Amino acid sequence: MTLQQKELFQKSPLLLENGETLSPVLVGYETYGTLSASRDNCILLEHALTGTAHAAKHFEDDAPGWWDDYIGPGKTIDTDKYFLVCTNVFGGCSGTTGPSSINPKTGEPFRLQFPGFSIKDIIKVQRELLEQLGVTRIVSVIGGSMGGMQATEWAIDYADITDSIINIASPLAAGPDAIGYNLIMRMAILNDPDFNGGNYVGQPEGGLATARMVGMMTYRTSELFSKRFERFTVAESSPAAFSKEHFQIESYLQYQGDTFVERFDANSYLYLTKAIDLFDVTAPAKDDLPAFSKIKIPYLLIGITTDQLFRIHDLRRGYELLKEWDVPVTYHEVASEYGHDAFLVEKEVPKFEPLIRSFLSNLPVKSI
């Protein structure tokens, strides 16, 4: 079954963390496997910043998903055993209500009139969807990068129906370097003349492509770039090369930027990167205790030692904090020349798959 959509918050509006409301909210999602009679065999999979709900193929000729190697009969997320749900995040642009959606009050796209939102708001929408789908318990919430932030929020806000968390390459709070990169990317978009205060007709392609290029430099490593590109040049030149020498790394980054603008919305990029910046579960909650101290369910944290976006020292610090507060946390580190995006790379599956499979297989037995 491919992308489905469900309209939520029709009678009672979605109340966001900042006090604003929104109604209705359309959610795009895909499911794999079958919900059990006891409705407690669900795994919720969270995508990263620019991901979609299409996590895996549904049939042989289907478009590849972003986690095909982990999903299917007999695989890590065994669809003969689990009912997997993957949503497009609230505020995104691939099936779920976001800045490019039509504002029912005006008949025009929300654009920058869309309300600000947090990671907590994203999972609130997911919780409503799962309730509508009849899910009563979640075996595990799994996510990498921004998806790991969502998974962590689930452990805090909805531990009553969640049995475990798997967080890959995501800290307990966005660090200053990640926030800085996000600022640079947003400024590239905001300073594009075609952005027009968010009221663009076509994409502000130059700014959005530049933002993507900056992002790609943080998702990979200098080791990988050196091995793949060295100082090699390509035959064709480009105005951006500013000379007849056009380096392969330049061509690669331009390709990444050019293809990205065809599938992603600039306003969504602004909102989602800001939601990442604001994520901080180390901050005191209403009871003056750090929000993460409420986590009482098994929590797998996987850090990537070569990560250029969410640095390994932040993951290690997160692990120490979780231990200090008696969170039942398991921590592993993976080394990879692919850096932050290693968990999305087919070649690196043998490094991650055993950790995830072992964690899931050692959870307390439930009626699944």
Swiss-Prot record:
Record domain AB hydrolase-1: where: 43-346
Residue positions of the active site: 145, 307, 340
One GO-annotated biological process of the protein: methionine biosynthetic process
Binding positions for substrate per the UniProt entry: 212, 341
Subcellular location: Cytoplasm
Top-level taxonomic group: Bacteria
Keywords: Acyltransferase, Amino-acid biosynthesis, Cytoplasm, Methionine biosynthesis, Transferase
Matches recorded under Pfam families: Abhydrolase_1 (PF00561)
Family, similarity comment: Belongs to the AB hydrolase superfamily. MetX family.
HAMAP family: MetX_acyltransf (MF_00296)
Purpose of the protein: Transfers an acetyl group from acetyl-CoA to L-homoserine, forming acetyl-L-homoserine.
Name this protein carries in UniProt: Homoserine O-acetyltransferase
Gene source species: Listeria monocytogenes serovar 1/2a (strain ATCC BAA-679 / EGD-e)
Lineage, highest ranks first: Bacteria, Bacillati, Bacillota, Bacilli, Bacillales
